[in-house]
A protein has these predicted regions:
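Sec/Tat signal peptide C-region and signal peptidase I cleavage site
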Residues: 22-26
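Extracellular/secreted glycoprotein ectodomains characterized by long, lumenal stretches
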Residues: 27, 83-93, 200, 218-228
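Short helix-loop boundary/capping segments
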Residues: 158-211
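Bacterial N-terminal signal peptides
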Residues: 9-19
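Surface-exposed, glycine/proline- and aromatic-rich loop segments on solvent-exposed faces
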Residues: 53-158
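Acidic/polar low-complexity flexible segments
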Residues: 27-31, 105-109, 220-262
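N-terminal low-complexity, Pro/Thr/Ser-rich intrinsically disordered segments
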Residues: 27-54
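Bacterial N-terminal signal peptides that target proteins for export
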Residues: 1-10
Length: 262
């Protein structure tokens, strides 16, 4: 695992990802918000004219704290959460749509090994597989068929050329290794946590309330906002989950300029 990962390769990765601009098949993109709510603090981003995916066209990103709770907030020019991947019927090659908050937090903050990559909080939807085995998000009595329902993760990211030039992946766990993992790790061979914090969607906004043992670490952190598509490797092998299309970056360059508001 990378022991000294800086923001420089991360910024390069995002620029490369924009250049890749892989096509993504989806439905439900056009749901304009005619009276978007006002958003204060955090990062404000210009709406994209005639955005191809307004549900992922970031206009505001923020993290605030109250007590030991951090609220991850993102607003878009369309209706948040209305667009999900089109089911493919199989795991291999399937897609994940995401709202992501890359942070300066060390991965050890949430139970991974220290300095193991870039810690990001994410809200995702992927109809072809379920990675929250402890939770029944749809309330149908089955905990293994809810991948299409928007849900939250912590992920650790690193660049990997196997995903494409300058592309990011969720860090793989090599065979025979036993890295430190959160108690709610879903059993996949990647650095991912499924903590069960439920996202709340309202018109143009998605928010998630997340408790922390040490809120001071969060208050000292910086962040950015990203919307992106990821894809499961067609061979279902390392690298298992790659970022294949970045829809938008709040700062434009992934410099993590956002400051957490106490």
């Amino acid at each position: 695992m990378c022991k000294h990962l800086s923001l420089t390769p991360l910024a390069f990765t995002v620029a490369a990802a924009f250049a890749i601009n892989a096509p993504v098949w989806a439905h439900g993109d056009r749901h304009p918000v005619t009276h978007p709510a006002s958003h204060s603090g955090g990062l404000h981003t210009q709406a994209t004219k005639q955005a191809a995916k307004p549900a992922f066209d970031i206009v505001h990103t923020r993290i605030t704290t109250e007590g030991n709770i951090a609220t991850f907030h993102m607003a878009v020019s369309g209706r948040a959460g209305v667009t999900r991947p089109t089911p493919s019927g199989k795991l291999a090659g399937s897609q994940v749509f995401s709202y992501v908050w890359p942070t300066s937090l060390d991965p050890s903050t949430v139970g991974f090994d220290a300095k193991s990559g870039i810690l990001a909080f994410a809200v995702t939807s992927h109809p072809d597989f379920d990675d929250t085995p402890l939770f029944d998000e749809s309330g149908d009595g089955q905990a293994t068929n809810d991948g299409h329902v928007w849900h939250s993760h912590w992920v650790v990211l690193q660049p990997d050329e196997a995903c494409g030039k300058g592309a990011l992946k969720v860090v793989d766990i090599p065979d025979g290794t036993k890295p430190r993992l959160p108690k709610t790790w879903p059993g996949l061979p990647i650095l991912i946590d499924s903590p069960g914090w439920s996202p709340r969607f309202s018109r143009d906004t998605v928010e998630v309330r997340v408790p922390f043992d040490d809120i001071g670490v969060v208050q000292a952190a910086s962040f950015d906002g990203v919307t992106a598509a990821l894809r499961v490797n067609a061979s279902v092998h390392n690298p298992l989950l790659c970022v294949v299309n970045v829809f938008k970056v709040a700062s434009g360059d992934l410099s993590l300029p956002g400051k957490v508001q106490p």
